[in-house]
Amino acid sequence: DSEFAELKIRGKIFKLPILKASIGEDVIDISRVSAEADCFTYDPGFMSTASCQSTITYIDGDKGILRHRGYDIKDLAEKSDFLEVAYLLIYGELPSGEQYNNFTKQVAHHSLVNERLHYLFQTFCSSSHPMAIMLAAVGSLSAFYPDLLNFKEADYELTAIRMIAKIPTIAAMSYKYSIGQPFIYPDNSLDFTENFLHMMFATPCTKYKVNPIIKNALNKIFILHADHEQNASTSTVRIAGSSGANPFACISTGIASLWGPAHGGANEVVINMLKEIGSSEYIPKYIAKAKDKNDPFRLMGFGHRIYKNYDPRAAVLKETCKEVLKELGQLDNNPLLQIAIELEAIALKDEYFIERKLYPNVDFYSGIIYKAMGIPSQMFTVLFAIARTVGWMAQWKEMHEDPEQKISRPR
């Protein structure tokens, strides 16, 4: 039987359908409130508003649970590779061996970008941030695929594959241009993560030998960042897509949203904070500053809009961080890691943080891993974009396949 919630406005009662969720909280359908009650609902930041129906990702923030298509994020990070998870998000199921091989071949086939794109890079000054270059380059792909300006359902999967394939190439090109080195072409004999590292660190005169520990760590990071419900950048992609904008334009809007320091740029801010703290002996001083309402200092890498428990992604990254630093001989002498571990230990025992349910989030350890890998801080958000493109494309595809999809237009 249908359930309803009752809303009383100026003495009149309105029955609002309660929509049953397959998992998690049920939802009150308020779509007819404005027409029937002559009122709008007000929810700044969409704190209590579901903007769409989705079967891609589920989060229980109180319990620290994150699942993609029903699979726990920790299992995916430990047992899958990134393109398996990409397939899962886009198609709804993990691939068979044959499906996986076909999918990876398609991604490899589409990894090259048009040579004319090189001219676009040359219009940027040498000091340009790689995110600025990437944002422009991804948007410009619309010019190379004019057929997708009026895309059809048959294009959804091929478009997703093209985007997943080309984003790492553009990301590496953005980095190479920013440091004045020649672009490195993709090598289809390498897997997805190896290929990206190759394009980042090889030069025409020097081959880059991929360390398997580094590769596996980056693979986990990509998986952990692949999708995360209707966050700011994903919602931006959906809103842009709801107007019928071409997929390259939609993804470029997601990149723009991700660039913000409150979203994808947070791990770079964490690194800067750890550097500012400087030494474990100063941690109590900065803990006190974080508690002081009159002090602008914020303890970055703690707390999350959704999670009121330990972020499951942070738990995986903490162990991954130790594995990488051990492999590189930095486990006992990396000052940023030592500060981070002690800062976490102190904060988790402090009543101020316990009462407010402020736990380490995914940004707390990822930057330390990147720095150890030799990835500069201005590339952190670029790597986030590589991973999140998979989620953006899965969400974009799901939106266009939804018969109830409408153009987004908040009041």
UniProtKB/Swiss-Prot annotation:
It holds the Pfam family Citrate_synt. One of its GO terms (molecular function) is citrate (Si)-synthase activity. Keywords: Transferase, Tricarboxylic acid cycle. The keyword Transferase applies. InterPro entries: Citrate_synth-like_lrg_a-sub, Citrate_synth-like_sm_a-sub, Citrate_synthase, Citrate_synthase_AS, Citrate_synthase_bac-typ, Citrate_synthase_sf, Citrate_synthase_typ-I. The keyword Flavoprotein does not apply. GO terms for biological process: tricarboxylic acid cycle. It catalyses: oxaloacetate + acetyl-CoA + H2O = citrate + CoA + H(+). It comes from the Bacteria. The active site is at residues 304, 363. It is an enzyme of class 2 (transferase). Its EC number is 2.3.3.16. GO terms for cellular component: cytoplasm. Citrate synthase is found in nearly all cells capable of oxidative metabolism. This is Citrate synthase. It comes from Rickettsia massiliae.
